[in-house]
Amino acid sequence: MRAGKKVGICMIYALFLFAVTYVLMLAFSKYRPYIAVGSAAIFIATGMLPFDQILGAIDFNVLLMIAGTMGLVQLFIDSKMPALLADLIMEKVPNVQMAAVALALFAGIISAFVDNVATVLMVAPIALEICKKLKTNPVPFIISIAVSSNLQGAATLVGDTTAIMLGSYANMSFLDFFFYRGRPSIFWAVELGAVASALILAFLFRKEKGAIPKGAARTKVTDYVPTFLLVGMIALLISASFIQNKPEITNGLICVGLMAVGMIYTFFKTHDAAAVTGPLKAIDFETIGLLFGLFLVIGGITHMGVVDAAAGLLAQMGGGNVFAIYTAIVWASVLFSAFIDNIPYVATMLPVVTSLAAGLGIDPTVLYFGLLSGATLGGNCTPIGASANITGIGILRRDGHEVKTSDFCRIGIPFTLAAVIPAYIYLWLMYGV
């Protein structure tokens, strides 16, 4: 009895420290990396995250992907390709409003097949170039790109880690995300949400009616090799998703490896040390530090049973009503994923959902899809709810722009609601009725 009470008290301590950490990060956006790392140190020092679990809590694959892609993207920027793409987009859209929506949709398309963080790192430079040419604030542009990439992460098997987890757990193939058991699958639910959220973005940018100047000379690309390397990265990341039992850091090694290839190529071409120092300087170590700290914090509360307790509470909320359970899973997933990494949450909830469905004697598909859609989209509610958000904010900070929590939520919350509600209804009609 005493042991159980002690565990309960420790869980409360962990939950309290977790809550304080996130409140401080929301309130003091400039100091998020230091707050996260400081909180992680407390979790370790107090034993709430044991030493032997530290390495397991850190997602080195994500950190390597961010570092490698940032370096490769710097070579991409130096080649002038983002400036050319910005010119092409500006030629096709009538005003700033449609430029913002077009960039968000473009990011979403890429993100359906490539990791969300990599997508933001690739598309953000194009957005920054457009904003510089138009002399407009890039903050809402980058936020829109980040939330759109998060939305499309659930569209395909290779779009996001959580989608990969569900595919593996439920033995779903790449094509099962399009049509599953003879019915339109979750891909179409996500695209329905994408249409609704695009309308929301158009409304949020409704005042940006400034005309885009036409007739300007297109930027000349100085080197196409970085572009080929980025396209190669996309192809390799997609291909790697089909490899069974691959090392967990495979994607990270792909990104870092291609960055190294780009640096070596550029160095031998230019004989300039900037070919090496430039990409390395482009790596946002503050963003990496923030994610490093958050991985440890999430590892701490997971070890202390907070995530398991939250999953158990969610399982009890619906009672025996399937629609109530489905509703609870979707919206609780949205809420939890706004503040914690959705990877440990989804990993914990998948067996919970399976046992719930078995107990009720129902097909778990609707609960699986509800879990994935809610957990993937919930991260769009807050600036620290998803790695793509943190990455986008890091890019803006390096460009000299600070992002307030209110700035992010002004776009993130209505975007989330517009994306989740249609998907929530669609999935129930397809698989729940």
Where are the model-predicted features located?
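Helix-loop-helix connectors at the membrane interface of multi-pass transporters/channels
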Residues: 127-133, 168-170, 353-359, 391-403
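Hydrophobic transmembrane alpha-helices of multi-pass small-molecule transporters
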Residues: 1-77, 180-312, 403, 410-433
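Membrane-interface alpha-helices at helix entry/exit sites of multi-pass transporters
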Residues: 97-102, 132-144, 174-185, 359-369, ...
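Alpha-helical transmembrane segments and, especially, the helix-loop junctions at the ends
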Residues: 111-121, 138-176, 197, 334-350, ...
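Hydrophobic faces of alpha-helical transmembrane segments in multi-pass integral membrane proteins
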Residues: 38, 42, 68, 72, ...
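Membrane-embedded alpha-helical segments and adjacent helix-loop junctions characteristic
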Residues: 52-139, 290-360, 364
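Flexible loop linkers connecting adjacent transmembrane helices
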Residues: 79-93, 131, 173, 208-214, ...
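Short aromatic-rich membrane-water interface segments that cap or initiate transmembrane helices
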Residues: 176-187, 316-320, 324
